[in-house]
């Protein structure tokens, strides 16, 4: 394992001390918020660095005691027993520091544009898409985030053919970004009289909410159509052309929005989704090139990749990217144990990043 960058750690400690000193002086409310936010980000790393250096000093003292031929034999034996435990703790802290120093995804703190679509499996796929969306809703609530549905198309038997929502909360993209891909369910539908297990699927897309400065969209690249909103069966549900369809000509990405009676609101929502999809498409292209080079299992962003299976008869959830199986299906679907999968995927991704640094 590579040595820690001591000079960089010294700079971080100095920055932390300088920020704390600024708080003791006169500071306006806007600057105060910036300082406290940066301190909150630095605190875990600074605590780990201080603990690491303290343990390292203790190991040095013990080494001196063990090497001293005049030291008490009983004390030397006790020191040798403590030495192994301290070295293990030192290694744990060093790894914690390495992970904290990994490059941060600039989008990790962004809100999320979440899209869940029914795949193969007919009505059962729509029901499963509904289950997945509610799982994310409950998980978001546990994180203290909010979820706002932007557009929804309900399935004939319930659930959703497609649902698009905005998940708002600090770190939403960091925790949800590995959920993109094909989710498969194996269960006996309520309408199945023979007790046969059916397999169906739904596709999840998790995209960071991007701003105009993040993605440049030229007006000439857009084809905008307006129309009257339609309900189930295709009938018009209002007399004004409030529905809007925006096509991004260079990429062929199309966004249709009709949930609001206001064309202005539909257009704003459609542009938000379009920006996220354009950004996401470019990231998928870059990620595919990177993962092809590094053979990464997690983070490839491939929407066609089957990432997880929910087997109801066996009560298990298996994430195929990291070969992790949890026999906690009810808790996962309830959003309570989804965090275990999220944490495992994050740890695996961080391990891949550390390995890449060592290449």
Swiss-Prot record:
The modification N5-methylglutamine is found at residue 235. GO terms for cellular component: cytoplasm. It comes from the Bacteria. Methylated by PrmC. Methylation increases the termination efficiency of RF1. GO terms for molecular function: translation release factor activity, codon specific. Peptide chain release factor 1 directs the termination of translation in response to the peptide chain termination codons UAG and UAA. This is Peptide chain release factor 1.
